[in-house]
């Protein structure tokens, strides 16, 4: 026996009628085409079906609310992270902090001049690094990414900044825009090159080493460390400005027409930013949202002056020399396995130059009230709030280089030799 609902589930077969009943007034005569019981004629659905439908309709609404909550949570954590990166406990009084003993200034200047007056030793830095770290240092490593590079297992194994896994097409696109990928010819022609890597340390202020620093063949400056207004202490010659997007100087005054801009690429949008800088294009607003601070809108240099740092140098610095653990997948942040730009630049210098000197390096965390940088009022205590770099391990590494005579410390922030 069929129920009424079941009867409504199918149409009755059409059967022609031989005799038509008289139609009431005002109604159409039924025909073989109207003698069908449609679904719309059936009774309303049962209460059980209606309840299920209401439940299904509520599910998407609940899902949207959950997604919104997660989005707001992530955004809130991101804001707190940005605030933490830019937070410092206090500012130092620069007038009081920058007094330097005149005798100390004279000794520092004399020592720096002695370093320059000695005969340059070809391949000294590479040879010394190879002896000190053996198989952990490669003497054949190229400093910059080449247009037709040798196959590198390390480069394809790691994500930025240690390699270019999944970014090979972006790298090739950038290299097509860059006509040169090595040191300029006038520097390559030198039989023996002296490098100085100038850090941002407050110890530089007052030493008046600017004139001496300008005499090095290759002067490497880091991030946005300024020259304008500080040339007496840090010089005004720049051969290489090495930085990542957020660290690049915002002022055109910090760029000279013959500088090399060496880009260190950490994340996907860094590739977009560098391409925009080379092509003199405006970076889209949505791309800017992925940087943790304001980035330069233009770099006033020609394409031939841009270089891309070989990421294997960062890999060599982090995993081989400093022996940090390899990167692990994390939901938020990074392990402390990313070296500072300064230490990466020191290793780069050993691949570029025959002799290497340092100035403006050294974090004395036992003196929290001393100036962190030569150009601002941040105190050394601010280093206690950074979470990306292992300052203790890096300090031991630099001290080892100075003690073994691989590099010279001109400002005495790592180990004073004067």
Curated annotation (Swiss-Prot):
Keywords: Disulfide bond, Epilepsy, Glycoprotein, Glycosyltransferase, Golgi apparatus, Intellectual disability, Lipid metabolism, Membrane, Signal-anchor, Transferase, Transmembrane, Transmembrane helix
Topology, Lumenal side: 83-418
Expressing tissues: Ubiquitous. High expression in brain, skeletal muscle, placenta, and testis. mRNA widely distributed in human brain, but slightly elevated expression was observed in the cerebral cortex, temporal lobe, and putamen.
Topology in membrane: Single-pass type II membrane protein
One of the protein's GO biological processes: ganglioside biosynthetic process
EC number: 2.4.3.9
Subcellular location: Golgi apparatus membrane
Glycosylation sites: 86, 236, 390
Region (Disordered): 1-25
Pfam families, alphabetized: Glyco_transf_29 (PF00777)
GO MF assignments: beta-galactoside (CMP) alpha-2,3-sialyltransferase activity; lactosylceramide alpha-2,3-sialyltransferase activity; sialyltransferase activity
SS bonds (residue pairs): 195-353
Catalysis: reaction(s): a beta-D-Gal-(1->4)-beta-D-Glc-(1<->1)-Cer(d18:1(4E)) + CMP-N-acetyl-beta-neuraminate = a ganglioside GM3 (d18:1(4E)) + CMP + H(+)
Main location: Golgi
Cytoplasmic compartment segments: 1-61
GO cellular component, one term: membrane
Family, per entry: Belongs to the glycosyltransferase 29 family.
Involvement in disease: Salt and pepper developmental regression syndrome: A rare autosomal recessive disorder characterized by infantile onset of severe, recurrent and refractory seizures, failure to thrive, psychomotor delay, developmental stagnation, and cortical blindness. Deafness is observed in some patients. Affected individuals have patches of skin hypo- or hyperpigmentation on the trunk, face, and extremities.
Protein name: Lactosylceramide alpha-2,3-sialyltransferase
Organism: Homo sapiens
């Amino acid at each position: 026996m069929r129920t009424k609902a079941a009867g409504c589930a199918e149409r009755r077969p059409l059967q022609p009628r031989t005799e038509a009943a008289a139609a009431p007034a005002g109604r159409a005569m039924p025909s073989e085409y109207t003698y069908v019981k449609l679904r719309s004629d059936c009774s309303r659905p049962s209460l059980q079906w209606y309840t299920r439908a209401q439940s299904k309709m509520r599910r998407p609404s609940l899902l949207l609310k959950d997604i919104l909550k997660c989005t707001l949570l992530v955004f809130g954590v991101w804001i707190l992270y940005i605030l933490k990166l830019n937070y410092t406990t206090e500012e130092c009084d620069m007038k009081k902090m920058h007094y330097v003993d005149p005798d100390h200034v004279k000794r520092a200047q004399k020592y720096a001049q002695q370093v320059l007056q000695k005969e340059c030793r070809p391949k000294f830095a590479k040879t010394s690094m190879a002896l000190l770290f053996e198989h952990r240092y490669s003497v054949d490593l190229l400093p910059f990414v080449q247009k037709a590079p040798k196959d590198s297992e390390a480069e394809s194994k790691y994500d930025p900044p240690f390699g270019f896994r999944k970014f090979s097409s972006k790298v090739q696109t950038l290299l097509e825009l860059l006509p040169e990928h090595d040191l300029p010819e006038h520097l390559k022609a030198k039989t023996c090159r002296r490098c100085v890597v100038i850090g941002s340390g407050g110890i530089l202020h007052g030493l008046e080493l600017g004139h001496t620093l300008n005499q090095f063949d290759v002067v490497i400056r880091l991030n946005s460390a300024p020259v304008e207004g500080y040339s007496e202490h840090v010089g005004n010659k720049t051969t290489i400005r090495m930085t990542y997007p957020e660290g690049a100087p915002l002022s055109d005054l910090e760029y000279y027409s013959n500088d090399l801009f060496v880009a260190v690429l950490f994340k996907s949008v860094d590739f977009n930013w560098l391409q925009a800088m080379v092509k003199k294009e405006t970076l889209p607003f949505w791309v800017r949202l992925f940087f943790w601070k304001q980035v330069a809108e233009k770099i006033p240099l020609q394409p031939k002056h841009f270089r891309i740092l070989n990421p294997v140098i960062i890999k060599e610095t982090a995993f081989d020399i400093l022996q940090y653990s390899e990167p692990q997948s994390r939901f938020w942040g990074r392990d402390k396995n990313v070296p500072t730009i300064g230490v990466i630049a020191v290793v780069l210098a050993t691949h570029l130059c025959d002799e290497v000197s340092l100035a403006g390096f050294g974090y004395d965390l036992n003196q929290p009230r001393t100036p962190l940088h030569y150009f601002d009022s941040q105190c050394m205590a601010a280093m206690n709030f950074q979470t990306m770099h292992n300052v203790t391990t890096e300090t031991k590494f630099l001290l080892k280089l100075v003690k073994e005579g691989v590099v010279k410390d001109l400002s005495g922030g790592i180990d004073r030799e004067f």
